[in-house]
Each structure stands twice: as structure tokens, then as C-alpha cells.
């Protein structure tokens, strides 16, 4: 009986070793493909918020970490710097709307250093399906209403939902969600205007405590 137990133990050990080895091989083979697909999707997202004709650097490789309450919390957010002939012209900046109806709304905002919004995308949210989820491009083109708009300072009343006297539509039965997004875009764009003097001192992604 002991011999049988030992034999089964050896068999299980060999099986475990083979399985572990196969898993390692599969991971090694698929990792480059996964990384490539992730990079492609990231570039597509960045080009949606900063038009590619505005820059000629590899924007996804110029990633910096920024932390500021204007971005919705004090967590590090990634900033992608767009350059034209080595001159900084715009950024795509991750940001958070902390006051969504169902919690945080994670976004990315592309803007120039003089307050012009190039594009905005929501990358994660938990808003109510059929109501607040109209902030998603696949459901509604509302998010494109920011394109080309300029934020004229902190007191710019146009940068608000219509219910608050601004220019942006709210959703039927859902004002909290679009209000949170509009306010986050405004705060983030105003913050981007302050960045030119800080760019040289920003930590690169991975160097900060993220």
C-alpha cells in the first residue's frame, strides 16, 4: 500500500511539474501578443482624445505620473505627452470624476495647454444602464460634445450641464452622471493649462509610487 501511495505521489509530482512547465511556456509565447494588443488598443484610445495629426512622437512612450486633487483624488494618474517636432503641444491625461451617481467614473481627457479640449473618453464606470451609461461612446455620442470646446477659466459658466446654466445636455432621468463628467473635464483641462512649467520634473510612469 505504501508503494502505491509513493507511486501516486510521484505521478502527481511529475504531472504538476509538466503542467507548470506548460503554463510557463504558454505564458512566454502569448505575452508578446498580449502586450502588442494592449499597446494597439492604448494607441487607439489616445488618438481618440488627441488627434494624431497634432503630434509626431510616440505618445504612448512619453508617460508621466501626476498627482493632484484636480484629478478627482490623490491617486497617481498617467499623463501622455504629445509633441510636434519635439515641442509639447498637448496631453492625454487620466482623471477621475468622484461624484458619479454610482461612484468613481474613470476617464481620459485630451487637451491643449491653452484650454482646448480635443477629446474625452470614459474608460470605466458603474453608472445605471439605460440612464447614466450614455457617457459611453458605444451607447451615445454625447461624449463627443466636448470636442473643440475651450474652458475659459474656473468661472466659465458655459462648461456645465444645461440644468446648471451651461452648454452640455443632461440625460433624461440622469443629471448627476453628466454633471460629474462635465465638471471633471473642466477641472482636468484647467489643470493641464498649469502643466508646461512642470513637465521637466514629472516622474515617468513606473518611477513613481503607483
UniProtKB/Swiss-Prot annotation:
Its cofactor is FMN. GO terms for cellular component: plasma membrane. One of its GO terms (biological process) is electron transport chain. The modification FMN phosphoryl threonine is found at residue 175. GO terms for molecular function: electron transfer activity; FMN binding. It comes from the Bacteria. Keywords: Cell inner membrane, Cell membrane, Electron transport, Flavoprotein, FMN, Membrane, Phosphoprotein, Translocase, Transmembrane, Transmembrane helix, Transport. InterPro entries: FMN-bd, Ion_transpt_RnfG/RsxG. The complex is composed of six subunits: RnfA, RnfB, RnfC, RnfD, RnfE and RnfG. Belongs to the RnfG family. This is Ion-translocating oxidoreductase complex subunit G. The gene is rnfG.
